[in-house]
Design a protein with these regions (language model features):
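Formylglycine-dependent
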Residues: 1-58, 67-76, 273-274
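Loop/turn elements at helix/coil->beta-strand transitions in domains of secreted/extracellular proteins
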Residues: 57-63, 112-118, 157-159, 219-221, ...
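The substrate-binding groove and active-site-proximal loops of carbohydrate-active enzymes
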Residues: 31-43, 82-95
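Long, internal low-complexity/basic segments
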Residues: 184, 237, 249, 259-277, ...
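Short glycine/proline-rich turn/loop motifs
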Residues: 24-34, 78-83, 164-168, 282-287
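Histidine-centered active-site microenvironments of extracellular/periplasmic hydrolases
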Residues: 72-76, 82-88, 92, 109-168, ...
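C-terminal cap/loop subdomain of S1 sulfatases and analogous C-terminal strand-loop tails that border
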Residues: 128-134, 138-152, 169-173, 177, ...
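Short, solvent-exposed turn/loop segments enriched in Gly/Ser/Thr/Pro and often Arg
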Residues: 63-73, 120-128, 203-204, 226-230, ...
Length: 346
């Protein structure tokens, strides 16, 4: 989205004195620095990451490298056009793999690989354009899971998480325990022996034991909270996942998305009108059977737990955080409080 300009340390690197017309698929017109080309963004990000690693190779470092792909505008470099044999979106993803490889190669060259934790993951599930792409190419970005980016269904939240850490993470190992990217903050803090302040990382639990191969309930009795693009909540603990709303909580799957290209969306299922949804994610990871009426005790328990988290402003032990409830329409599932109710201060 415009303005098209790089930012370094809270300052633009150059004034966007030019104007860019729609150049690539999904691009938007707007102010830009002279000579801006979308296809140069990903190589530039990678160059910056590699340069930072080179400058800090003698001391511990942390690099967060969020790439512009596969977001719009879809603008793969010239060398990658046609590489996926699918479409420009696929070509863009091939380029992502290339630039991750560049970082890995540099770590190897600097002899840092054996002492560096590398994580490759995604912030959400695939875009809804995966449905026509699945029909056209047979490629299913969300696998068999229901929903997409923005949704509280599994397809909206389950993402790849690939981690390499020689000496800690066993090569070729697999973790079957669900965790959240929110947990990264507590994980990195534990790795670095840093104690987080009581008001930071209030929903974060370290997954270091999982990285060490200790599969199990790393969260104990603490649940994971999901949040959709419309602000709707879901809560997950153990085998159970409770969506505190009807439908996806995010994307609309109306008449325009009921064709065979969108097979699997909620409006084609019998429980589409339920105002809450309960799934056993161990036996029904595809979220096909709503157990909201069959397991009321689970619904009550998880609803109460979610309410406790909201009122405390956190899902981990610690002091209560400031929470504003009165103007939060997505909390319509929360038990009503007296009109003079005021949330407790931290």
């Amino acid at each position: 989205m415009p303005p098209y300009v790089f930012i370094r340390n809270d300052r633009v690197t150059e004034q966007p004195t030019s104007s860019l017309k729609e150049e690539d698929k999904g691009g938007r017109q707007g102010p830009a620095v002279p000579g801006w080309r979308h296809k140069h963004v990903m190589p530039t990000f990678t160059d910056e990451a590699i340069s930072y690693i080179q400058r800090n190779k003698q001391s511990p470092f942390f690099v967060y490298m969020p790439l512009n792909a596969p977001h719009t505008p879809h603008a793969p470099g010239d060398a990658f056009v046609g590489k996926s044999k699918l479409d420009i979106y696929g070509d863009f993803m091939v380029e992502v793999d290339h630039h991750i490889g560049r970082v890995m190669d540099e770590l190897n060259r600097l002899k840092l690989s054996d002492n560096t934790l590398v994580i490759v993951t995604s912030d959400n599930g695939p875009e809804t354009n995966m449905y026509p792409r699945r029909s056209k190419f047979g490629h299913d970005s969300s696998s068999h899971f229901l929903g997409a980016k923005r949704d509280n269904w599994e397809g909206g939240h389950r993402v790849p998480f690939i981690a390499r850490w020689p000496g800690v993470i066993a090569p070729g190992s697999k973790c079957d325990t669900p965790f959240s990217l929110v947990d990264m903050m507590a994980t990195f803090a534990e790795i670095m022996s840093v104690e987080l302040p009581e008001d930071q990382g209030v929903d974060s639990v370290s997954i270091l034991p999982l990285m060490q191969g200790k599969n199990g309930d790393y969260r104990g009795s603490h649940a994971i909270i999901h949040h959709s693009s419309s602000g709707r909540f879901a809560i997950r603990r153990g085998d159970w996942k409770l969506l505190l709303h009807a439908g996806s909580g995010g994307n609309g799957y109306g008449a325009g998305k009921r064709s065979s290209r969108y097979k699997g969306t909620i409006e084609q299922k019998s429980f589409k009108t339920a105002n809450r949804q309960l799934y056993n994610m161990r036996t029904d990871p595809d979220e096909t059977t709503n157990l909201i009426e069959k397991r009321p005790e689970v619904v009550s328990e998880l609803t109460a737990l979610a309410g406790e988290y909201v009122r405390k402003g956190r899902s981990t032990p610690g002091p209560r955080q400031k929470t504003v409830l009165q103007s939060w329409p997505q909390l319509d599932w929360l038990p009503k409080k007296p009109t003079n109710f005021r949330p407790e201060k931290p």
